[in-house]
């Protein structure tokens, strides 16, 4: 592939690479352009890495902006409003029949309308998140007033819409999905800080070499697991009406090549994103109840309850709750990505059947069974890497396994985007080779 990249007959690919790198670099630089009234002292007090580790929204912002909130700038809100808007539109298409019809039956026109809806919703979410961030800064900005509030919000909204524009340019004229590449690039840009943070943490721990070996081993194992789960597929053999009419043995042999490939990682990283939002909601609800009532203080007044509700009890309870949410959202999002009813209907329209399975309800039941199996494997993989690493971290007293927020989420995003980008580059090279 390197030889092909150096070939002068690949100007379009080179232009795509240059455009992608240029826009990603501009976005990264833009995250360091100061927002009015937000100084370094403000960031240290509110948005530093140490404080953000206990704030789920800050963790999400860290993941999707690559730690940009440690140097909060004009473009630091980044692609997060667009991610939120895309999730909501995906959910609404499964709930609202008109949107579902627009997506499935109206072709390119329907897809363009959904893209427009996503843009409008992105603008709305940019307003909501910018106002929320501005309001959270009121306690650490000395000269707080409505003008400061307005300028900070306006700056973040403008930056978010610029990032959305760049993302669409990359998707249309660059190397791949713009939002995914932006997230990936920001995560990679923050790796030096993460490595530095890890080395500092190791200095304060006993058996440094064993910890380093353990960290590297865990990183390699999880990376291999991410690659495997991302590339693994289940092949379901298909037969069309045209193939059934073929009589010769050679044709029957060739007809077995038609398959429906179902990825094991159907839901991708979205179950973890949904889970993070759910944790954010319940954490906020807990804080509101705690401030407004003294119900939790009443519980801890009793010695028996105080001894039972220990640190480890709460930790285990949280892990069970976390794992349950991941399992639920993996099943939920898998049905959004691949609806067995829709697949069975498309098979019926195209006169295609699954080998050995009757069309109609039998096909739908069979696909639902396969989808449940896939979702179960995917959920176990995510739970093992998220909860398992947290348990190992607590038992071994290691503070570096999940570096700064959603470490495994970032790792899974990196693997998915890098594999997809390599495939797209190969596809562009093959297209240009055939063209010339």
Curated annotation (Swiss-Prot):
GO terms for cellular component: chloroplast thylakoid membrane. GO terms for biological process: intracellular protein transmembrane transport; protein targeting. Its main location: plastid. Keywords: Chloroplast, Membrane, Plastid, Protein transport, Thylakoid, Translocation, Transmembrane, Transmembrane helix, Transport. The keyword Transmembrane helix applies. InterPro entries: SecY (IPR026593), SecY/SEC61-alpha (IPR002208), SecY_CS (IPR030659), SecY_dom_sf (IPR023201). It is a multi-pass membrane protein. Pfam families: SecY. The chain crosses the membrane at residues 17-37, 72-92, 122-142, 146-166, 209-229, 269-289, 309-329, 380-400. Signal peptide: none annotated. It is found in: Plastid, Chloroplast thylakoid membrane. The keyword Chloroplast applies. NCBIfam families: 3a0501s007 (TIGR00967). Component of the plastid Sec protein translocase complex, which is composed of at least SecY and SecE. The central subunit of the protein translocation channel SecYE. Consists of two halves. These two domains form a lateral gate at the front which open onto the bilayer between TMs 2 and 7, and are clamped together by SecE at the back. The channel is closed by both a pore ring composed of hydrophobic SecY resides and a short helix (helix 2A) on the extracellular side of the membrane which forms a plug. Belongs to the SecY/SEC61-alpha family. This is Protein translocase subunit SecY. It comes from Vaucheria litorea. The lineage of its organism: Eukaryota, Sar, Stramenopiles, Ochrophyta, PX clade.
